């Protein structure tokens, strides 16, 4: 699972905006859970902020499969944030599947960067 930071942006200082997944997986890694804990802490302090969790996949697989996988990934992040007290009415889920790659390469490193869920401020 990709753990680099070259594609990461930040919701706030020290709060990364994205988590990464293994191939064909929507299970959160230890690193992903740590990032989401930071996001939850920031969201609790900023209770007026709503977010969209954007699920993404790499280029392999059909459009339909990757849209469903992206949705499962975003929902995994949503469920985890909710366990830390973030209300579901503050979180929207959207899947882009393979339509918005952060790296357009066709190799294992590019694919690992594209298997992600990105947290975006909605307001």
Where are these regions (language model features)?
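Periplasmic peptidoglycan-binding/tethering modules of Gram-negative envelope proteins
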Residues: 1-50
